Regions:
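N-terminal glycine/serine-rich phosphate-binding loop of ATP-dependent small-molecule kinases
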Residues: 1-100, 128, 234-246, 431-435, ...
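A structural motif corresponding to the C-terminal end of an alpha-helix
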Residues: 208-215
Length: 504
């Protein structure tokens, strides 16, 4: 039930850009601003961002969206945040200056640390406590790397001078002038340091990784007032005092924004990576199929969990065609090329540029194109790139249905690549279930806005969000089932060529 009229500013801090979207109380977009920023690749398999650029671009987007909206400060009820998860920032709590670049979720530099933790037998404990697997994807080993490799960092951390946060924590700390060092449960659950059943940091894991617990943010629910916008933020002077009151990691926010509020409902986000989540309700299911368990959100004392599988490179593989190979000028051209040929010509592309995520969890896999002949052309490669995204999502859904012990009847989709009707149709063909694309594709930002709106009185309960979702198009399977199976069988052969490629 709508309690009051009001507008919510959603900050959507992603892997390649910072965005700000203002929503009204009916879920309509009032204004939007976006600022892309530079990716940093210091070494093969390493990925970084400049934390100050993350902050500055996010504040610029927020300021521009507010200016475009034509609203007054009194119209804004609150601010919600959603963010790229796992990306790790360590900063000086007195100066606010980062001690090193943000180590991005895609970064593989800590694979040797993970290998050692696995060899030490820590895997079962990590899974029991955190719901995760030991992998360089998660924040814990990234923090350890910074403390071990930045001169003086460990000593400063032990003296209580340094703070850690994922991007949500970094933004909230800066928006509130350093008054709130917090992180919501959904983000905490992606660090490999968090006890997801007791909703607290795990002392044993922090000790094993050598991470002082004084660095860690206070774990908090996803919907509550964390603080207010501080004075003096450039371009945001008029928003001083507005409550910052909702936060969730991007995939958790998208699950809510897609109205997957009933156990068994699932969504997939097609962004830089692909992220498939299934609501498991109040039960934190431990996967036997290579998936992980995370907190989805916590509202009014009720915590909701999700099963999750992650594909590390999805939309980024289309960017690779554009930026590194020069085969396309825009993402839409990939669709046009893919549709210009009747099939993939036997070409399969495995986009394991930074390893393979769920369900294989192969940190040493690398990208591969197989099946090339003299007749292969750029259209076949473009088609293979899009099809490769769909195959990986199928692998996730197959694993998820084993863990959930029930079939998925429909998959809700969002994210930038979901605008590709070719990809959505091929996904339906591979999964053999309908694909439901919503009218509002900004589901991640809306999930964050909804959490903020719950805290500041725009909406009353999580059930209210169900009234706001509308479908744009339903894609139903069209391909012959036997043909679909043959395509996927060939894909499995291609993945086998890429696995363990860089392992010495």
């Amino acid at each position: 039930m709508l309690i009051m009229n009001g507008y919510i500013i959603a900050l959507d801090q992603g892997t390649t850009s910072s965005r700000s979207i203002i929503f009204d109380s009916k879920g309509n977009i009032v204004s939007l601003a976006q600022y892309p920023f530079t990716q940093i690749y210091p070494k093969p398999g390493w990925v970084e961002h400049d934390p100050m650029v993350i902050l500055e671009s996010q504040l610029l987007a927020m300021s521009e969206a507010f200016e475009k909206s034509g609203l007054s400060p009194t119209d804004i009820a609150g601010i919600g945040i959603t963010n790229q998860r796992e990306t790790t920032i360590v900063w000086d709590k007195n100066t606010g200056k980062p001690v090193y670049n943000a180590i991005v979720w895609q970064c593989r530099r800590t694979a040797p640390i993970c290998d050692q933790l696995t060899a030490d037998g820590l895997g079962p404990y990590v899974k029991e406590k955190t719901g995760l697997l030991i992998d360089a994807y998660f924040s814990g080993t990234k923090i350890k790397w910074i403390l071990d490799n930045v001169p003086g960092a460990r000593e400063r951390a032990e003296r209580g001078e340094l703070l850690f946060g994922n991007v949500d924590s970094w933004l909230i700390w800066n928006l509130t002038g350093g008054r709130a060092h917090v992180s919501d449960y959904s983000n905490c659950s992606r660090t490999m340091l968090f006890d997801i059943d007791n909703l607290c940091w795990d002392e044993e894991l922090c000790t094993r990784l050598g991470i002082p617990m004084s660095m860690l943010p206070v774990p908090v629910p996803s919907s509550m007032v964390y603080g207010q916008v501080t004075a003096g933020l450039p371009g945001l002077e008029s928003l001083e005092g507005i409550p910052v009151c909702g936060s969730a990691g991007d995939q958790a926010a998208a699950l809510l924004g897609q109205v997957c509020i009933v156990p068994g409902q699932a969504k997939n986000t097609y962004g830089t990576g692909c992220f498939t989540l299934m609501n498991t309700g109040s039960k934190s299911v431990r996967s036997v199929s290579g998936l992980v368990t995370s907190v989805a959100w916590s509202v009014n004392g009720k915590t909701t969990y999700a099963l999750e599988g992650s594909v590390f490179n999805a939309g980024s593989s289309i960017q690779w065609l554009r930026d590194e190979l020069g085969l396309i000028g825009t993402a839409h051209e990939c669709d046009i090329l893919a549709e210009s040929v009747s099939d993939n010509g036997g070409v399969y592309l495995v986009s394991a540029f930074t390893g393979l995520g769920a369900p294989r969890w192969d940190m040493y896999a690398r990208g591969a194109i197989v099946g090339l002949t003299r007749g292969s052309n750029k259209a076949h490669i473009a088609r293979a790139t899009l099809e490769g995204i769909a195959y990986q999502v199928k692998d996730l859904l197959d694993a998820m249905q084993v863990d959930a012990e029930s079939p998925i009847s429909v998959l809700r989709v969002d994210g930038g690549a979901s605008v590709s009707s070719f990809l959505m149709q091929f996904q339906a063909d591979m999964l053999r279930v309908p694909i439901d694309r919503p009218k509002l594709v900004e589901t991640t930002a809306f999930g964050a806005a909804f959490l903020a709106g719950l805290a500041c009185g725009v909406w009353e309960s999580v059930d209210d969000i169900a009234l706001l979702r509308q479908s744009d198009r339903i894609f139903k399977p069209e391909m012959d089932a036997e043909q679909a199976k043959q395509y996927h069988d060939n894909w499995l052969r291609a993945v086998g060529r890429a696995e363990k490629w860089s392992q010495e």
